[in-house]
Amino acid sequence: TTTAPSVYPLVPGCSDTSGSSVTLGCLVKGYFPEPVTVKWNYGALSSGVRTVSSVLQSGFYSLSSLVTVPSSTWPSQTVICNVAHPASKTELIKRIEPRIPKPSTPPGSSCPPGNILGGPSVFIFPPKPKDALMISLTPKVTCVVVDVSEDDPDVHVSWFVDNKEVHTAWTQPREAQYNSTFRVVSALPIQHQDWMRGKEFKCKVNNKALPAPIERTISKPKGRAQTPQVYTIPPPREQMSKKKVSLTCLVTNFFSEAISVEWERNGELEQDYKNTPPILDSDGTYFLYSKLTVDTDSWLQGEIFTCSVVHEALHNHHTQKNLSRSPELELNETCAEAQDGELDGLWTTITIFISLFLLSVCYSASVTLFKVKWIFSSVVQVKQTAIPDYRNMIGQGA
């Protein structure tokens, strides 16, 4: 029977956080069948990750994933464990937070005893880049509350813009989850200019299971915006024998990482594409790849596909690059095939020429040798005939 996993954060004790780095983890337990995938910060955190092989016990699988981060970045920066179980269509997110201490600490002890985990977790998400940059759309900042228990299901969410409370947010009814908890989503519509100018948005969550309200704050990342470079890459010739081909869009050299990449076909939005998360490059900018899968026939018929990019540093925040099977591409492929054929023919000609040349040399050498031998024999015979027999002549004179 298909069973969704439960996810538990693995948090170090206070004595394990004094070094230059700290190891955090996620325990994914009680799922069937395999596989599950575990990512950190939606794939943005990839270095220092170790995943322990899954173990089958009592008919269910378990595995753990660990990530090592600098102590200076946690808990000041968010670390999230993302778990996906395709078989049950389950996607879970777990924020790795410090342990919640009990009120009392023994005298002379630097660590509170009996640290416990519990209560809801709260995440805040920025508006989608396309929503924040296109005037025709409405950007929203979203607060997600997870692990709300059945015993204390009531959640109250308050919103603040630059520390001034606002009342324009809407909160959805709580949703039951696979692990017998609830999820609550609250969204705050915002003004484009407020986000672009760096205003600070905060959600404050109250719940009886929390010892104190949880606050999460977000604003537009600071830093000088850098314009992305967009390149489209046609499918390789080797794919043409298959039913589907892959079109690629490389977007590089951009900052900030907030970006939207979509595909269109003849002006209509496509769905069958996948984007990598923005990846931090060595120079501090970001890059990503986007892959669109299409029928080979559509590509061969010359349909026009468009990689559409939205980013704050672009003129009018938007750019497009078209990709289609062009006559030049066909000519290049034809020329390449012709060149391959010509090379094959050339090698055949060269082989025949070398063979004939060697045969000719052997024949000429044989004929020359025969002629030399014949001439030498003739010369010897002539010399023998021309030399007088002096002994006979002397005998006759006597």
Curated annotation (Swiss-Prot):
Transmembrane segments: 350-370
Region described as CH3: spans on this chain: 224-327
GO molecular function: antigen binding; immunoglobulin receptor binding
The keyword Secreted appears for this protein: yes
CDD domains, per the entry: IgC1_CH1_IgEG, IgC1_CH3_IgAGD_CH4_IgAEM
UniProt-listed InterPro entries: Ig-like_dom, Ig-like_dom_sf, Ig-like_fold, Ig/MHC_CS, Ig_C1-set, Immune_Resp_Modulators
Swiss-Prot/TrEMBL keywords: Cell membrane, Glycoprotein, Immunoglobulin domain, Membrane, Secreted, Transmembrane, Transmembrane helix
Record-level GO cellular component terms: immunoglobulin complex, circulating; plasma membrane
Biological process terms in GO annotation: antibacterial humoral response; complement activation, classical pathway
Hinge, as annotated region: 98-113
Region (CH2) residue spans: 114-223
PROSITE patterns in the record: IG_LIKE, IG_MHC
Claim: Transmembrane helix is one of the keywords in the record: yes
Cytoplasmic face residues: 371-398
Sites carrying sugar chains: N179, N322, N332
Region annotation CH1: where it falls in the sequence: 1-97
Cited Gene3D superfamilies: Immunoglobulins
Pfam families attached to this UniProt entry: C1-set (PF07654)
Name this polypeptide is given: Ig gamma-3 chain C region
Organism of origin: Mus musculus
